[in-house]
């Protein structure tokens, strides 16, 4: 960021840990998410009327700062910002226990990511979770990529449209879910159950996806109700985590 750009933004007291969110869909989703604090909206003179109308019609209380397109390039480290950069807090995540206390729907689908570390994979999986009508995505407090602009962009802004939960000890959280009548399935290439064969009449299902390299941890596997697999060409070694998660969630979402 140039000194000129810093001077334009300094008066808004943006926290040091703020992230910038760029692109039309991610910016809109962030501005409408009550679990996020948005500080300022940076756009070009050409796009001012569009974004001004958007925040007025959606009753979003935020200041607009006009910048040149090249300045937005610098802020976002990208030339794919589409004329919009929003400075925001990270999403305020609920605890799983807090979410379950307020859970009223019998049919609930929860996705748990167990030590996935690639931001692009995590963002893509969150996007698929929203697309296939999952209700929440659980991220471990540790061994999970921090929320960044690239992760948000990879989710196409869907991270702001689905409930994001934070969990600690996974085995303990699995037991909490079981007490709330969730059936817990883990996606694993050595699973005995084909993903399309699970009983989807179970009202509450939690699906766990393991890390990109090692997959599910042994202790996690031992606490499952079942390990499920995706049938693929036997000459193909495996799918990557994001693709496998998408296929599994699609199958679970089918009636």
Where are these regions (language model features)?
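N-terminal positively charged helical leader segments and presequences
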Residues: 1-101
């Amino acid at each position: 960021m140039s000194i000129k750009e810093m001077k334009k933004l300094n008066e808004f007291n943006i926290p040091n840990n703020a992230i910038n969110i760029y692109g039309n869909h991610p910016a809109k989703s962030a501005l409408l998410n009550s679990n996020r604090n948005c500080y300022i909206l940076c756009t070009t003179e050409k796009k001012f009327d569009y974004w001004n109308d958007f925040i007025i019609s959606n009753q979003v209380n935020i200041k607009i700062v006009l910048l040149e397109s090249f300045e937005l390039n610098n802020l976002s480290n990208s030339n794919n910002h589409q004329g919009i950069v929003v400075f925001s807090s990270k999403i305020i995540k609920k605890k799983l226990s807090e979410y379950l206390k307020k859970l009223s729907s019998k049919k609930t689908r929860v996705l748990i990511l167990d030590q996935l570390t690639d931001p692009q994979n995590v963002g893509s999986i969150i996007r698929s979770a929203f697309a296939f009508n999952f209700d929440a995505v659980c991220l471990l407090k540790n061994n999970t990529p921090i929320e960044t602009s690239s992760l948000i962009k990879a989710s196409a802004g869907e991270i702001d449209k689905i409930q994001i939960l934070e969990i600690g000890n996974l085995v303990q959280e699995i037991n909490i879910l079981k007490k709330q009548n969730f059936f817990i399935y883990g996606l694993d290439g050595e699973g005995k159950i084909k993903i399309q064969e699970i009983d989807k009449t179970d009202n509450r299902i939690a699906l766990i996806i393991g890390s990109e390299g090692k997959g599910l941890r042994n202790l996690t596997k031992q606490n499952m109700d079942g390990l499920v697999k995706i049938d693929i060409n036997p000459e193909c070694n495996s799918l990557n985590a994001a693709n496998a998660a998408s296929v599994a969630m699609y199958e679970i979402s089918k009636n």
